[in-house]
Amino acid sequence: MTDEIPWGPTGELVYNRTYARTKPDGSKETWPETVERVVDGNLALVDRRHMLEGEREDLVRLMTKFKVLPAGRHLWASGVKNAQHLFNCWVAGWPEKISDHFQFTFMRLMEGGGVGANYSNHYLEGYPEVVNPLRVEIVCDPEHVDYQAMKDVGILSEHYSHDWAGAYAIEDSREGWAAALVDLIDTHYRPGTVHYQRVYDVSRIRPQGAKLKTFGGVASGPLPFAVMLQKVANIFSEYAGITLDGIAAMEVDHAIAQCVVAGGVRRSARMSMMHWDDYQIDKFINIKASTGEHWTTNISVEVDDEFWRLAKEGYGSFAVAREDMPKQKRAHRVLKALSEGAVRNGEPGMWDSSLSNVGEPNRVVCTNPCGEITLEPWEPCNLGHINLAAFVTPAGKTDYLDLIRAHRLMTRFLIRATFSEVADPKSREVLDRNRRIGVGHLGVASYLALTGSRYSEAPGDKRFTQFLREMAAEVDSEAERFAHDLRIPVPVKKRTIAPTGTVAKMPGVSEGIHPIFSRYFIRRVRFNLNSDMAELRRLAAEGYEIEKDLFAPNTEVVSIPTKDTLVQAVEELGWDEEIVESADELTLHQLLAFQALYQMCWADNAVSFTANVHPDAYEAEDVAADLKRFAGLIKGSTIFPESSFPQAPYERITKQQYESAAAKAVEDGVDEECANGACPIK
């Protein structure tokens, strides 16, 4: 059966590591078994009378051959009894009680999802002042397996015993951990508090290394959670007598994410945003460099129509009113920071809230961590993808009939997914109201090359732009038909482009709409020490370079010399490899033009796209000029310089360097990190 599955070079490895579930007999699923589980689980979400004739068979066929692929969370959780957590990422809002924000963030991250939040201070200014400074005291039964480790690092209280009846006993569950966090935060705001030591008993928390069944991975033990409680208490205590501001709230969420990343399979994924005219915007933009922290999040600046109006005009322009000049100065300063960050290390990114809110029934406030879906507070993203490259015939033509069928079926798949359970009533309300879905494309660069087209020429190719509009119309019409059949609102928006990092690796096609990074490169893959040790040992035995991750705990980095698989495919067709254009052969203008093409002709949601550039090829002024040129045409931007930090996800090498390494060609050119064009959330 394996030979019949069109795996990419590392596709089976990625599947076995990420999506294959353990069966009752202890063996792992095969890909056909996963497909049947996913399809049957999805179809069971609505009454069978709403199923099309042959719909199950078509979905199984298309998914088995990697022609359609739902987002990784569907592959992992669809059809799993009592664990159908089908949504990848969320946006956390700012409700009446501030602890609800942090509880929501903690719960979604512990479930393996990603969380975005907008930390602009106008969202926090209505909260009351922090009342009480508190000191967290941690106690634990000496019989606990991790007791000595906690004692050795000095986390345990010297003043309280685990036998004290007044200690808060933390239950060993996600809900129990979140409840303790809420208790701590609410105590900071509770008038009349007499005792400023809050004692938490972690004796019931399972020890480090215990297996986690629902979401995979292993337990981190009580230590990271205890550290988080102390960090959170320290942050709130610093604000006793004043209102928590956006930067402080961001620090709390970072502490929460650090706790989550300490155990389990996945790294935490977050998006942090702040409005360009916020009084803390300069501190926000420089927060990673100035603190050495906040590695759990991507950061983006929220801009809007006013920002572009002011940024496009020169100082002293008669088009800018005198009272707007201070704002204009800030707009120019922020644009300069965006542009300098792009050529320095890729951050911050940019998100256009004015353009993103066009067509929205209610205000969207942030994106998911990878930036392809703009969301209301508490709303999840719900993604599925069409692999365009899989519909190219051996003659280099497009199988339009099957491609149209694929777009329609993925639309129906995602609408059904909106009926799945969610843990938070706030999310249920917005999900029922919006029914937002995100049908996307992957393998786009592969599709263009395999049909004889150059990536750089696509924005000016009327046939390709018409093709995108026709496929978009198929999604929209099917969404309307199916929603009416189900008697639910038509999805508010339906089409997107996601980075598709992990799922694209299974068929081995280009990720999302990205060009290949380079024909030859070193790709660095992150592995979790707790859950991926067997694979790490195998790769070490094969001679790959392995080193500790400099940024994330419990993680090792494997360096793999790689020849891009698309180059191989083109060579096998007898074509010149130069029809495959890599990122280093494309200008920033050409890259942003391709993003704008997909934003205008395909996506009503957003387009997640990383323009990878050589840092020596562009000055900040060049980036600013292109950002202004594409203002109003793209909803966000991430411009990322190659090799901008140690252990960069990819590093360009020459053909000669690749051949001298005598390495097996294993993958295409974009890594799994959100900030660099792909997503770690499965």
From Swiss-Prot:
Broadest EC class assigned to this enzyme: oxidoreductase
Disulfide bonds: 89-381
UniProt keyword list: Cobalamin, Cobalt, Disulfide bond, DNA replication, Oxidoreductase, Redox-active center
EC number: 1.17.4.2
Reactions catalysed, as given in the entry: a 2'-deoxyribonucleoside 5'-triphosphate + [thioredoxin]-disulfide + H2O = a ribonucleoside 5'-triphosphate + [thioredoxin]-dithiol
An annotated Gene Ontology molecular function: ribonucleoside-diphosphate reductase activity, thioredoxin disulfide as acceptor
The protein's required cofactors: adenosylcob(III)alamin
Swiss-Prot/TrEMBL GO biological process terms: DNA replication
InterPro entries, alphabetized: RdRp_reductase_class-2, RNR-II_ins_dom, RNR_alpha_hel, RNR_lg_C, RTP_Rdtase_AdoCbl-dep
Any Pfam family matching the protein: RNR-II_ins_dom
Active site (UniProt): 370, 372
Similarity remark: Belongs to the class II ribonucleoside-triphosphate reductase family.
PANTHER family xrefs: RIBONUCLEOSIDE-DIPHOSPHATE REDUCTASE, VITAMIN B12-DEPENDENT RIBONUCLEOTIDE REDUCTASE
Protein name according to UniProt: Putative adenosylcobalamin-dependent ribonucleoside-triphosphate reductase
